[in-house]
Amino acid sequence: MKTKFIFVTGGVVSSIGKGLAAASLGALLESRGLRVTHQKLDPYINVDPGTMSPFQHGEVFVTDDGAETDLDLGHYERYTSARLSKKSNFTTGQVYFSVIEKERRGDYLGGTVQVIPHITDEIKSKIIENAKGSDIAIIEIGGTVGDIESLPFLEAIRQFKADRGAANVLYLHVTLVPFIKTADELKTKPTQHSVKELREIGIQPDILICRCEQDLPRDMKAKIALFCNVEEKAVITSQDAEHIYAVPLALHREGLDEQVVEKLNIWTKAPDLAPWQQVVEKLMNPSHGKVRIAIVGKYVNLTESYKSLSEALTHGGIANDCRVHLTYLDSEKIEQEGIDGLLEDVDGILVPGGFGERGTEGKIKTIEFARTRKIPFFGICLGMQMAVVEYARNVCGLEDAFSSEFKPDCLNPVIHLMEEQKGVSRKGGTMRLGAYPCTLTKGSFAQKAYGTLDISERHRHRYEFNNKNRTVLVENGLVLSGVYKEGDLVEIVEITDHPWFVGCQFHPEFKSKPLNPHPLFKAFIAAALQNKKA
């Protein structure tokens, strides 16, 4: 089958849910037996989001091949079976970088390099390259129609219909139909203007997904269809859902996937949505009540910084048939004001990754609380490193133990810079990134969770466990239960005389899915549930 291309644009406001719409459509088409891939095109000039503040960009999602990408790729991987790569996300910065390199090599034979055709051709070539081997390629354009930064991308996808044939290209526009409380009615004018602007660029949307607080009445769908030049059945309501994993089912009820396969002239089997129905049922009606998990981090004022993490915890709840209630606590506040009263009622504590010294002592206090009070604990990346620091200080008696990242001259740097990172001065794309193998210790918490001895997980770090302190930590009871054998790098630490205490250097949240929860999150929530019952 010749690859079909679906381009997803957004209008009226940012953060309208294009990523979730694209991911949900991918899930629906995959349930029909189609091979789906995803791609996100970001209009900013940064080469990638790896050096951007979490407060500006939210989470950086890491792929198996080490790409630092937009958090929407996390949605795509969670909703489908796709394993995305460096080709799945590119930016204006990458496009211009590539074109300028070609110009310097003389690839354009002395011609004047312009946005059209050179930039648009580069964009199209990257889209085509990523789509190879798939039946459907769903490409989301970042930003909002009308943004000046998006224009080269929109021009490139406009040309796609002429290049690939109208039967192989579909334009899907996600827009807002706001409810005005004072008038007590939904308003279609923002959608009309958004589509008008898109049509002025030369793109006529085939399907509209209308985000709204309440159901769109039929007469309003007819009005939108008339003024936006689409079929009435192609006006899809996307009402605010109680949970994001209910969105694929809601869009299916609206006929989204049926419209897509009809307009692209694809024959498919009937969709099998039973797995999604089971997920939603467990979310809405859990058998075991709820568990309370505290996430103690430094980016808690923007929870999008922990998007994959919060979703992975939800997946752990699905696996244990319970609801997970998350409480976000600022580690810097704990550092300044103490821990009293903040963690008394939680069933489990998670300390996530991060960069910089701010809030680290608050994380260490939190870890000590979890260790001494026997509360199930999960430390990820920096959370694992601070667990090692806490153990070294309070159990091994190494009072000045710390990470050389924060105190280069400390006498006991139990965490230190990786050998291959020494001398690296450039920030972008230079960390230990992507998937690496890890060998587990038989009988450990981690091995019991995975059910195997050999695993592969994704990383994003420069600092590691310092093997010079290995003996003293092990002699005092710290279990090094996961090791990257090639570099003798400690990946997982545990405490055995504890209900569940695990720290890992990698980011397991990047591989968790609602239909296939990650083993460590499944085990962590199970321990928290057991702690609640106790």
Swiss-Prot record:
Reaction equation(s) it catalyzes: UTP + L-glutamine + ATP + H2O = CTP + L-glutamate + ADP + phosphate + 2 H(+); L-glutamine + H2O = L-glutamate + NH4(+); UTP + NH4(+) + ATP = CTP + ADP + phosphate + 2 H(+)
Residues that coordinate or bind UTP: S14, K187, T188, K189, P190, T191, Q192, K223
Amino-acid positions noted as binding CTP in the UniProt annotation, renumbered to this chain: S14, D147, I148, E149, K187, T188, K189, P190, T191, Q192, K223
InterPro entries associated with the record: Class_I_gatase-like, CTP_synthase, CTP_synthase_N, GATASE, GATase1_CTP_Synthase, P-loop_NTPase
GO molecular function annotation: ATP binding; CTP synthase activity; glutaminase activity; identical protein binding; metal ion binding
Activity regulation note: Allosterically activated by GTP, when glutamine is the substrate; GTP has no effect on the reaction when ammonia is the substrate. The allosteric effector GTP functions by stabilizing the protein conformation that binds the tetrahedral intermediate(s) formed during glutamine hydrolysis. Inhibited by the product CTP, via allosteric rather than competitive inhibition.
Region (Amidoligase domain): 1-266
Known pathway: Pyrimidine metabolism; CTP biosynthesis via de novo pathway; CTP from UDP: step 2/2
Domain Glutamine amidotransferase type-1: residue ranges: 292-534
Source organism, top-level taxon: Bacteria
Annotated transmembrane regions: none
A cellular component term, taken from the record's GO annotations: cytosol
GO BP field: 'de novo' CTP biosynthetic process; pyrimidine nucleobase biosynthetic process
SUPFAM superfamilies, per the entry: Class I glutamine amidotransferase-like, P-loop containing nucleoside triphosphate hydrolases
Binding-site residues for ATP, renumbered to this chain: S15, I16, G17, K18, G19, L20, D72
Binding residues for L-glutamine: G354, L382, G383, M384, Q385, E405, R462
Active site: C381 (nucleophile), H507, E509
Additional remark text: CTPSs have evolved a hybrid strategy for distinguishing between UTP and CTP. The overlapping regions of the product feedback inhibitory and substrate sites recognize a common feature in both compounds, the triphosphate moiety. To differentiate isosteric substrate and product pyrimidine rings, an additional pocket far from the expected kinase/ligase catalytic site, specifically recognizes the cytosine and ribose portions of the product inhibitor.
Classification via NCBIfam families: PRK05380.1, PyrG
Function (record text): Catalyzes the ATP-dependent amination of UTP to CTP with either L-glutamine or ammonia as the source of nitrogen. Regulates intracellular CTP levels through interactions with the four ribonucleotide triphosphates.
Family: Belongs to the CTP synthase family.
Record-given protein name: CTP synthase
Origin organism lineage: Bacteria, Pseudomonadati, Thermodesulfobacteriota, Desulfuromonadia, Geobacterales
Gene that specifies this protein: pyrG
